[in-house]
Curated annotation (Swiss-Prot):
Belongs to the PPR family. PCMP-H subfamily. Transmembrane segments: none annotated. GO terms for molecular function: RNA binding; zinc ion binding. It comes from Arabidopsis thaliana (Mouse-ear cress). Keywords: Repeat. InterPro entries: DYW_dom, E_motif, Pentatricopeptide_rpt, PPR_At4g14850-like_plant, TPR-like_helical_dom_sf. This is Pentatricopeptide repeat-containing protein At2g22070. Residues 585-660 are annotated as: Type E motif. Disulfide bonds: none annotated. The lineage of its organism: Eukaryota, Viridiplantae, Streptophyta, Embryophyta, Tracheophyta. The keyword Zinc does not apply. Residues 661-691 are annotated as: Type E(+) motif. Coiled coil: none annotated.
């Protein structure tokens, strides 16, 4: 038998190179590379830079950065490709520290080197660094390629920073790359993510060549801004559609509440295309079934998933659990969790299951499921906390959060947002600050949902400055909730003009308000007495933003007219409402009648309110107070007697203050506090001092026919005054006092607290049922209009 003829070095070199090039993107690439590597060493082919570069490239693309680096170090000669290959290997594994270190060693940096750095930072979510690297690249005189620009635009889209995006766009025009399809598609996506549909359309209309991605981007954009008809029109124009096209249509209709249309598009996809639904398709159609409570269709989709062998995990599992939980199939949802575990379970899926049991009135079963879980991850903990928070069990939520953190579980943005909501509901600044600290430690402080919750928490706890800081923290990532939360916060704290300026800025930024935003806008107009602006915004809401007014909007407008003394206009507004006024609407009118002493209209408002809620103590009290304020003591007594006969209990006024993490509650003439003697003595001293300063007790605020001396004593012992006295003796000088009250602050307390703030040299913040009052140096932020 003849011996094999040995291969020449040139033939062996060619063979090894071909093997490597064919294996670059294959699963066995690393194995092939190792075989070739051994052959290279045995045959002494280390001299071939071309072969070594190919070998390094395989190691790099298969994730073996250390192998690539070792080979690089052994090479006698290196090219720019050699350096960039190792750089890419480090970047692909997400090791940007090593990538930066190696980048600094490069003898010469070309566009590939810089782009590798940009891609690396983008892939690990450090978008701002990716953008900065491109800036450095341009300063070095290196011209970006289309691949550089598409990755930079993706980073800009992720940060949603429009100003940066426009600068990159201008640079693209200068480079003459706006005709490139990939770059134009990236521009489309960037403008869509940044919320500028006009610029996105501008780019699309000027594209000479469009591919499926171009059309998909415009469909997604139309869906994002609620232009479903335009999205449908572009969908119909497309000669070719991919799975992204169908998903954009289905998810767009689903997210906008057009769930039947989403299911219709899904049916059309199955009927007219050869494409199979992917996990995003299935998640959207299951969500549509959940919203429509179509259990039958949901079961059919579940059956399709099982029969086609589709993997039930991730978003599909969550969508199935949500669908069954919301459609009355809670037990099926529970069995799915038992079978699949909670590894892939998202907060929405687990919360849907909890809500399913809670809707059945079975919170214990929800708790039992939680307790039975062997491996409780952050999702399980968060779902239970959210469940407690949504159902007002704040103590349980706090205790569970402490157990979670104490057990070493790190909270996520959902956990922190829920706990901040708990702190908001309790108006507890100390709890809120603790959660804020947890957000900083966990790195979730830059999450939009956490920042939005921080804005609300600080606002409700009386710290508008910290609320503004939280708002500023997410300058490039604000959503409608962010703007709305800050507008409402400013309105509640008496900064009405700032609230309206912020609203106008929001519009200029290209964001459209929702129905809650307008509640904040009307509230700002109400607190500042801006009647004409309120009318204009009401018309704008209907005509420009096409928002159908709800009872909340109508009640706000009645409150606006009523506080301004336009009682006749308020009444006419109610009469023209296309929907039946509710308790809040009539209550706003009744409250205005009490302030402006209009007995006749007040009686009408009270009667209509009591027809809706016969046991509403507030209506009886407001009418009795109206009679008392007008000197009609007998009529007031009759109202109080009818309350007694009807066993309607008047809501008692309380004020509370948090000192050293403990809440102290006070009622009128409260004698239950352990430090009552010192509190009463302090209040007596303050009373005498502010009278010397010019304070005159408003005995008309005591709505009982009593002696003036008795009235004055009652005024001195109102709950908010006692809370202030306790705060003064329990906190260091210059400490801001924050008082919460469950009823409206009376005229006398409002006047007295202005004098007290000047006397003691402190800011006193009082939150009542209508707004925050910031008392400082003898003045109040409400300007005596509340």
């Amino acid at each position: 038998m003849d011996a094999p003829v040995p291969l020449s070095l040139s033939t062996l070199l060619e063979l090894c190179t071909n093997l490597l090039q064919k294996s670059v993107n294959k699963s066995n690439g690393r194995f092939t590379a190792q075989l070739v590597h051994c052959r290279v060493i045995k045959s002494g082919l280390m001299f071939s830079v071309y072969l070594m570069n190919n070998l390094m490239n395989v190691y790099s693309k298969t994730g073996y950065a250390l192998h690539a680096r070792k080979l690089f170090d052994e090479m006698p000669l290196r090219t720019a490709f050699s350096w960039n290959t190792v750089l890419s290997a480090y970047s692909k594994r997400g090791d940007m520290d090593s990538t930066c270190e190696f980048f600094d060693q490069l003898p010469q940096r070309d566009s590939v080197s810089w782009t590798t750095m940009i891609v690396g930072y983008k892939n690990i979510g450090q978008y701002h660094k990716a953008i900065r690297v491109m800036g450095d690249m341009v300063k070095e005189g290196i011209e970006p390629t289309q691949f550089t620009l598409t990755n930079v635009l993706a980073s800009v889209a992720a940060t949603r920073c429009m100003e940066t995006g426009k600068k990159v766009h201008s640079f693209i025009v200068k480079l003459g790359l706006r005709g490139n399809v990939s770059v134009s598609n990236s521009l489309l996506n960037m403008y869509a993510k940044c919320g500028d549909p006009m610029m996105a359309k501008f780019v699309f209309d000027r594209m000479v060549v469009r591919d499926i991605s171009s059309w998909n981007a415009m469909i997604a954009l139309h869906m994002q801004v609620g232009q479903m008809d335009l999205a449908m029109a572009q969908f119909e124009q497309m000669a070719e559609r991919d799975i992204v096209t169908w998903n954009s249509m289905i998810s767009g209709f689903n997210q906008r509440g057009y769930d039947l249309r989403a299911l219709d598009i899904f049916s059309k996809m199955l009927r007219d295309s050869l494409l199979s639904p992917d996990r995003f398709t299935l998640a959207s159609v299951l969500s549509a079934c959940a919203n429509l409570e179509k259990l039958c269709i949901g079961k059919q989709i579940h059956s399709h998933i099982v029969t086609t062998g589709f993997d039930i995990s991730g978003i599909v599992l969550n969508a199935l659990i949500s669908m069954y939980s919301r459609c009355g199939g809670v037990e099926t949802a529970r069995r799915l969790i038992e079978q699949r575990g909670t590894k892939d379970l998202k907060i929405e899926g687990f919360t849907a299951l909890l809500d399913g049991y809670i809707k059945l009135g079975d919170m214990n079963q929800a708790k039992n499921i939680f307790v039975s879980l062997k491996d409780r991850d952050v999702v399980a903990w968060t779902a239970m906390i959210v469940g407690y928070e949504q159902h007002g069990s704040y103590g349980e939520a706090i205790n569970l959060f402490r157990s979670m953190v104490g057990g070493g579980q790190r909270p996520n943005s959902y956990t922190l947002a829920a706990m901040l909501s708990v702190a908001s509901s309790l108006a507890s600044l100390s709890h809120g600050k603790q959660i804020h600290g947890s957000a900083v430690k966990s790195g979730e402080i830059y999450s939009v949902s956490v920042s939005n919750a921080l804005i609300t928490m600080y606002a409700k706890a009386g710290n508008i400055t910290s609320a503004s800081r939280a708002f500023d923290l997410i300058r490039c990532e604000r959503d409608t909730v962010s703007w709305t939360s800050m507008i409402i916060a400013l309105a509640q704290h008496g900064h009405a003009e700032e609230a309206l300026e912020l609203f106008e800025t929001m519009l200029m930024e290209g964001l459209r308000p929702d129905h809650i935003t307008y509640v904040g806008v009307f509230s700002a107009c109400t607190h500042a007495g801006l009647v004409n602006q309120g009318r204009q915004y009401f018309d704008m809401m209907k005509d420009v933003d096409k928002i159908i007014p709800t009872l909340s909007h109508y009640a706000c407008m009645v409150d606006l007219f009523g506080r301004a003394g336009l009682l006749q206009e308020a009444q006419e507004f109610i009469e023209k409402m296309p929907i039946e006024p509710d308790v809040v609407t009539w209550g706003s009118l009744l409250s205005a009648c009490r302030v402006h002493k209009n007995i006749d209209l007040g009686k009408v408002a009270a009667e209509r309110l009591l027809l809706l809620e016969p046991e509403n103590s507030g209506a009886y009290s407001a009418l009795a107070n109206l009679y008392s304020a007008c000197g009609k003591w007998e009529e007031a007594a009759k109202i109080r007697k009818s309350m007694k006969d009807g066993r309607v209990k008047k809501e008692q006024g309380f004020s509370w203050i948090e000192v050293k993490h403990k809440v102290h509650v006070f009622g009128v003439e409260d004698g239950t506090h352990p430090e009552k003697n010192e509190i009463y003595m302090t209040m007596k001293k303050i009373w005498d001092e502010i009278k010397k300063m010019g304070y005159v007790p408003d005995t008309a605020s005591v709505l009982h026919d009593l002696e003036e001396e008795v009235k004055e004593q009652i005024l001195r012992h109102h709950s908010e005054k006692l809370a202030i006295a306790f705060g003064l003796i329990s906190t260091p000088d210059k400490t801001t006092l924050r008082i919460m009250k469950n009823l409206r602050v009376c005229n006398d307390c409002h006047t007295a607290i202005k004098f007290i703030s000047k006397l003691v040299g402190r800011e006193i913040i009082v939150r009542d049922t209508t707004r925050f009052h910031h008392f400082k140096d003898g003045f109040c932020s409400c300007r005596d209009y509340w």
